[in-house]
Amino acid sequence: MQKSIIEFRNVSKKFGNKTPISKVSFIVKKNNITTLIGPNGAGKTTIVRLILGLEKPTSGEIIIDRKLKIGYVPQKFGLTTDIPITVKKFLDLLAPNHFNKNIKEISSFIDLEYIKEQEISKLSGGQFQKVVLACSIINNPDLMILDEPLQSLDVTSQQEFYQLIHFIRKKLNITVFMISHDLFTVIKNSDQVICLNGHICCSGIPHEITPNSEFSNALSSLGFYTHHHDHKH
């Protein structure tokens, strides 16, 4: 049986009169790719902030080892592109020995050697996302949290991104927790899907998302159309 790395038990969070999440319970299993989906304002960011320890629950319990090392890739990375700095120099600032052990493990797979002399500002969206992922694994995390990583990426870059995620998980033995709104790619690439809209609407494994299933109907009620996206093992 797989070990759980995060467990939410009846967790609620209030900010004044607002309650972005209410009585939320779920488990993230070790070495799985778990994806949290939901509409804007569903409470996804609140969940991430609770996992990171930036917020405390108003009620309920979060079971997570605070010694757990987390690599976090925010929706907006916040790196200015005005400064003319190359990929190599940027990574050197974060890992002085350049291409530390983890980055070396994946550098050939993500073509870092090919782009390392390019300026950050000249990278495509897909190339920049690879650099961001390299940053997130420098400290050898147990858990990687990715907030809307597919945003602004074209279909080809999305496919390359997921190939990289699967490679990193296997090579470095990392658990992945992802926020996304793209149900089709989620179904194809996740071990577990959790649907949130202030509370847990449904959760399960991708092959359970079949036409007219309870899972599928719950997703459809939130605007996630599943009838074209049957997933078969």
UniProtKB/Swiss-Prot annotation:
GO terms for molecular function: ABC-type zinc transporter activity; ATP binding; ATP hydrolysis activity. ATP binds at residues 38-45. SMART domains: AAA. One of its GO terms (biological process) is response to zinc ion. InterPro entries: AAA+_ATPase, ABC_transporter-like_ATP-bd, ABC_transporter-like_CS, Metal_Ion_Import_ABC, P-loop_NTPase. Pfam families: ABC_tran. One of its GO terms (cellular component) is plasma membrane. It is an enzyme of class 7 (translocase). Keywords: ATP-binding, Cell inner membrane, Cell membrane, Ion transport, Membrane, Nucleotide-binding, Translocase, Transport, Zinc, Zinc transport. SUPFAM superfamilies: P-loop containing nucleoside triphosphate hydrolases. PANTHER family: METAL TRANSPORT SYSTEM ATP-BINDING PROTEIN TM_0124-RELATED, ZINC IMPORT ATP-BINDING PROTEIN ZNUC. Part of the ABC transporter complex ZnuABC involved in zinc import. Responsible for energy coupling to the transport system. Belongs to the ABC transporter superfamily. Zinc importer (TC 3.A.1.15.5) family. This is Zinc import ATP-binding protein ZnuC. The lineage of its organism: Bacteria, Pseudomonadati, Pseudomonadota, Alphaproteobacteria, Rickettsiales. The gene is znuC.
